[in-house]
Amino acid sequence: SELNLLKYKDIENFLTQNKPDLVIHAAGVVGGIEANINNPVKFLVENIQMGINILSASRMKRVKNFINLSSSCMYPRNSEIPLSEDQILTGELEPTNEGYALAKISTT
């Protein structure tokens, strides 16, 4: 079955029923470059909402461990390789992924 991470109550109910010790958040609204360009606000808002919902519900239900997988889109477009967390917010993001990238930054 699927769980809609945009619906806080659904997440809360899932956590109540399943009582996990660990939540791994790897979900994201994605769609490729064309979709990112055409719908940047959707990618920003829905990814932020999912992140807030799953973090908040996990905290409310006292989940012991939480792993948040993010994205290389969080890093400036001209970042040095290998990437390191201190590079986040140090330069311009890739414009075609900006909404998604900002959402991932805000929920990391």
Where are these regions (language model features)?
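Active-site helix of classical SDR
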Residues: 99, 103-106
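Rossmann-fold cofactor-recognition segment
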Residues: 1-9
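Conserved Rossmann-fold NAD(P)-dependent oxidoreductase catalytic core, especially the SDR/UDP-sugar
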Residues: 52-97
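Conserved cofactor-binding/catalytic machinery of classical short-chain dehydrogenase/reductase
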Residues: 7, 22, 49-53, 65, ...
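Short, solvent-exposed loop/turn segments at secondary-structure junctions
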Residues: 2-3, 29-31, 73-74
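NAD(P)H-binding glycine-rich loop region in Rossmannoid oxidoreductase-like domains
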Residues: 8-47, 57-60
